[in-house]
Amino acid sequence: IVNEQSLMQPDTDFVKIRLEAQRFLEDSCKNNNIGFSVCYFGDVYGNASWFTEMIVNRLKNGTFKIPGKGDYDKCFIHVDDAVGILLSIAKNNLKDQSYVCADSTSVTFKEFVDYTADKIGKKHPGGIPMFLAKGVLGSDLVKLLTTPMKISNQKVSEIYKFVYPSYKEGINSILES
């Protein structure tokens, strides 16, 4: 379970570049006596986002496929909660902190997608072999999407009360809007 004390082990180019940018910003802030805090967000979803475009719309037209079996744990956070956390950090002037930010529910990618399909009355999608997914999306993106991750949001929960404590409430709010 990943928390704020976990060792960083970037295994994709995307994460490596993101951590380099973080180090640059952190160093620049320290050199200029500016407080710095960082949020490590799970997969942020919301209306008119990758969730709507890549999952909902493709489930509706029957073209969505899950990379592999979808049995990898993922961490999700609704965009409203992501913004709420950032506002809480700013309003409370919390400096030199790190926060792991995702909702409180552990879920596999397949469970997340199947729940969405059920809510819109569509069939559960099948999987696509990993080698095909890598051919279409690239191996770095597939690795990023399919790396299992479980987190503890205990620290961030001390400064913020989630509007959507699980992906189910978050998905419902999007689909009902």
Which sequence ranges carry the predicted segments?
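N-terminal Rossmann-like NAD(P)+-binding domain of SDR-like oxidoreductases, especially those catalyzing
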Residues: 1-9
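Active-site Tyr-X1-5-Lys
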Residues: 9-37
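Glycine/proline-rich active-site loop of Rossmann-fold NAD(P)-dependent oxidoreductases
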Residues: 19, 32-34, 44-55, 89-99, ...
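NAD(P)-dependent short-chain dehydrogenase/reductase
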Residues: 28-74, 79
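Residue-level signal for the nucleotide or nucleotide-sugar donor/cofactor binding architecture
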Residues: 46, 74-80, 107, 151, ...
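Alpha-helical membrane-targeting segments
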Residues: 54-75, 118-149
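Mid/C-terminal beta-alpha module of Rossmann-like enzyme folds, strongest
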Residues: 85, 89-140, 172-175
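C-terminal amphipathic/interface module of NAD(P)-dependent oxidoreductases
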Residues: 123, 142-177
